[in-house]
UniProtKB/Swiss-Prot annotation:
The active site is at 337 (proton acceptor). In the N-terminal section; belongs to the N-acetylglucosamine-1-phosphate uridyltransferase family. Residues 225-245 are annotated as: Linker. Residues 1-224 are annotated as: Pyrophosphorylase. Its main location: cytoplasm. Keywords: Acyltransferase, Cell shape, Cell wall biogenesis/degradation, Cytoplasm, Magnesium, Metal-binding, Multifunctional enzyme, Nucleotidyltransferase, Peptidoglycan synthesis, Repeat, Transferase. It comes from Campylobacter curvus (strain 525.92). Pathway: Nucleotide-sugar biosynthesis; UDP-N-acetyl-alpha-D-glucosamine biosynthesis; N-acetyl-alpha-D-glucosamine 1-phosphate from alpha-D-glucosamine 6-phosphate (route II): step 2/2; Nucleotide-sugar biosynthesis; UDP-N-acetyl-alpha-D-glucosamine biosynthesis; UDP-N-acetyl-alpha-D-glucosamine from N-acetyl-alpha-D-glucosamine 1-phosphate: step 1/1; Bacterial outer membrane biogenesis; LPS lipid A biosynthesis. This is Bifunctional protein GlmU. Mg(2+) binds at residues 103, 222. It is found in: Cytoplasm. InterPro entries: Bifunctional_GlmU (IPR005882), GlmU-like (IPR050065), GlmU_C_LbH (IPR038009), Hexapep (IPR001451), Hexapep_transf_CS (IPR018357), MobA-like_NTP_Trfase (IPR025877), Nucleotide-diphossugar_trans (IPR029044), Trimer_LpxA-like_sf (IPR011004). GO terms for molecular function: glucosamine-1-phosphate N-acetyltransferase activity; magnesium ion binding; UDP-N-acetylglucosamine diphosphorylase activity. It is an enzyme of class 2 (transferase).
Length: 435
C-alpha cells in the first residue's frame, strides 16, 4: 500500500512498568515490542514513522538496527502532550495515515489493512470489552462513530458503555491535516487527544466508522503483568504455527521459542527447551532442559541439559548432557557429556571425552582451538588455546595440551603414576593385620 503512511506513537514514559528501561523496549518472545509492531507496519507499507520522546536515542538506535529506513519524530511533551500532540511534528505523506501505538505488539498487519480499506474518512478500531475500565468509550449512532469519551472525562451513563476505543485509527490525510490544528486541550489532563478528531469530523460532516477488532490483538501493555500475558499469547501462536508446520513438541506449554527462530524439516523439541534468538534448526532433536541461543543446528541431537551459546554451527553432531558449546563449529562430532567447547572448530569423526575443556581465555583475550578429523580425546583433557590438533590423533586421558599435535600422534601430558606400598597403614597408624 504505497499510498499509506503509518505513525507509531511511542513517546510515553511507561511509568507503570516501574523500570528505567523504555516501555517499548521490553521484549516479547525475544524482541522489543516496538519491533513487533514495526514488522507488521512494514508488511503493508514502506512509509513508517515512530514518535519518540523519553530515551529517544536509545529507542531510535534499536529501531535503526533493524529498520534503518524508519522516520523518527520527537514529541514536544511540554507544549503538546497527548496522542494528538504526538502528531504535531510528524510528516504526513500518504493519502491515508494509520496511527497506532508502540505498546500494542499483538496487532497484525491484517488488522491495519482492515482499517485502511474501510469506506470512511476516518476509521477507528473498537471492541466490546468484558471489563471496559481504563478505555475510552465509543459512542456509536446509526452505524457511525459519534464520539469517543476518555475514562477520566466520562459520565456515569458513558461509563456503562462496553464498546471501547482500541487505539488505532486510519485517516484520510487531508482530513487529518484539517482537523489536527482544531484540537484543544480543554480536559482534565490538559492533553491534546486524538480521540477529539471524531467529534470535530462529525461536526464537519465527515464519515467516521468503527472497525470491530479482536480485544486480544489490540491489548495494550502498561505493566509487567500485562507483558507476561501478551508474551504467553504470542508464544502460543508461535508454537501452534510450528506444530502445524511439522515440529513435534513434548509438553509445549513448557517450551520457549524466540519469534526470530526458524525451523526446517522434521524437528523435535522436548519439554523445558528454550530456543533463544535467531536460531535456525533443521532436522534435529533438542532434548529436555536444553538451551539454544542464536545458533544453527542441522541433523543433530542436542541434550538433555545442554547449552548451545551464540554463533555456534552444529551439523550431524551428538551433544550430550551438561555440554556447553560457545562459538563452536562442529560437524560430525560426538561430545557425550560434561564438556566445555568454546571458540573451537571440530571436524568429523572426532570423539570428545567426558570432562574435556577448551581453555580459550587467558584473562585478556579469547583464543581458538582447532581439532581435525577422527580425533579421539580422552576424558579430563584440557586444550589450552591457541592450539591445533591435526587429523587422526589420540589425546590421552588426563592430559593438558599446550602445543600443536601432528597427524597420527599420541599426545600425553601427565605425571607418571607411582604406587607406594603400605602407605595407607603408615599414614593412618593402622596395622595391616587390623583390616
Amino acid at each position: 500500500m504505497n499510498d499509506t503512511s503509518i505513525i507509531i506513537l511511542a513517546a510515553g514514559l511507561g511509568t507503570r512498568m516501574k523500570s528505567k528501561r523504555p516501555k517499548v523496549l521490553f521484549e516479547l518472545c525475544g524482541e522489543p515490542m516496538i519491533i513487533h509492531i514495526l514488522k507488521q507496519a512494514y508488511a503493508i507499507t514502506n512509509d513508517v514513522g515512530v514518535v519518540l520522546h523519553y530515551e529517544k536515542e536509545l529507542i531510535s538506535q534499536k529501531i535503526k538496527e533493524i529498520f534503518p529506513q524508519t522516520k523518527i519524530y520527537t514529541q514536544d511533551l511540554e507544549n503538546f502532550p497527548g496522542t494528538a500532540g504526538a502528531l504535531k511534528n510528524a510528516t504526513l505523506s500518504g493519502k491515508k495515515v494509520i496511527v497506532t501505538c508502540g505498546d500494542m505488539p499483538l496487532v497484525r498487519s491484517t488488522d491495519l489493512m482492515r482499517l485502511a480499506n474501510a469506506d470512511a474518512d476516518i476509521a477507528m478500531s473498537c471492541f466490546e470489552a468484558a471489563n471496559p475500565f481504563g478505555y475510552g468509550r465509543v459512542i456509536i449512532k446509526g452505524g457511525k462513530v459519534g464520539a469517543i469519551v476518555e475514562q477520566k472525562d466520562a459520565s456515569e451513563a458513558e461509563l456503562a458503555i462496553k464498546s471501547v476505543n482500541a487505539g488505532c485509527y486510519c485517516f484520510k490525510r487531508e482530513i487529518l491535516e484539517e482537523i489536527l490544528p482544531l484540537i484543544k486541550n480543554k480536559n482534565t489532563q490538559k492533553e491534546f487527544y486524538l480521540t477529539d478528531t471524531i467529534k470535530i469530523a462529525n461536526e464537519r460532516g465527515f464519515k467516521c466508522v468503527a472497525v470491530n477488532v479482536s480485544e486480544q490483538n489490540f491489548m495494550g501493555i502498561n505493566d509487567k503483568f500485562q507483558l507476561s500475558v501478551a508474551e504467553k499469547i504470542m508464544q502460543d501462536e508461535i508454537k501452534q504455527d510450528l506444530m502445524k508446520a511439522g515440529v513435534l513438541m513434548r509438553l509445549p506449554e513448557s517450551i520457549f521459542i524466540d519469534s526470530r527462530a526458524k525451523f526446517e524439516g522434521e524437528c523435535v523439541l522436548e519439554e523445558n527447551v528454550s530456543i533463544m534468538g535467531a536460531c535456525h534448526i533443521k532436522e534435529s532433536i533438542i532434548k529436555s532442559c536444553s538451551v539454544i541461543e542464536d545458533s544453527v543446528i542441522e541433523g543433530s541431537d542436542i541434550g538433555p541439559l545442554a547449552h548451545i551459546r551464540p554463533k555456534s554451527e552444529i551439523k550431524n553432531t551428538h551433544i550430550g548432557n551438561f555440554v556447553e558449546v560457545k562459538k563452536g563449529v562442529l560437524d560430525g562430532v560426538k561430545a557425550g557429556h560434561l564438556s566445555y567447547l568454546g571458540d573451537c572448530e571440530i571436524a568429523s569423526g572426532t570423539n570428545v571425552g567426558c570432562g574435556t575443556i577448551t581453555c580459550n581465555y587467558d584473562g585478556k583475550a579469547k583464543y581458538k582451538t582447532t581439532i581435525g578429523k577422527n580425533v579421539f580425546i580422552g576424558s579430563d583433557t584440557q586444550l589450552v588455546a591457541p592450539v591445533n590438533i591435526a587429523d587422526d590423533v589420540i589425546i590421552a586421558a588426563g592430559s593438558t595440551i599446550t602445543n600443536d599435535v601432528p597427524s597420527g600422534a599420541l599426545a600425553i601430558s601427565r605425571g607418571k603414576q607411582e604406587n607406594k606400598a603400605g602407605f595407607f597403614y603408615k599414614f593412618f597408624g593402622k596395622n595391616n593385620a587390623e583390616k
